[in-house]
Amino acid sequence: AEGDDPAKAAFDSLQASATEYIGYAWAMVVVIVGATIGIKLFKKFASKAS
């Protein structure tokens, strides 16, 4: 059991980091998708206005 502890600690740390990065990745995805939709809507309204 002693040999498993360092590996388990490293894995737990890696898992915590991965969860944190996935959270950042989702935030970026939301921003990018929101910006893309915003740009498309802006172009649509801009072409109607002119």
Curated annotation (Swiss-Prot):
Signal peptide: none annotated. Its main location: virion. The chain crosses the membrane at residues 22-42. Gene3D superfamilies: 1.20.5.80. Keywords: Capsid protein, Helical capsid protein, Host membrane, Membrane, Transmembrane, Transmembrane helix, Virion. It is found in: Virion; Host membrane. GO terms for cellular component: helical viral capsid; host cell membrane; membrane. It is a single-pass type I membrane protein. InterPro entries: G8P, Phage_M13_G8P_capsid_dom_sf. Residues 43-50 are cytoplasmic. Pfam families: Phage_coatGP8. Residues 1-21 are periplasmic. Self assembles to form a helical capsid wrapping up the viral genomic DNA. The capsid displays a filamentous structure with a length of 760-1950 nm and a width of 6-8 nm. The virion assembly and budding take place at the host inner membrane. Belongs to the inovirus capsid protein family. Homomultimerizes. There are several thousands of this protein in the phage capsid. This is Capsid protein G8P. It comes from Enterobacteria phage ZJ/2.
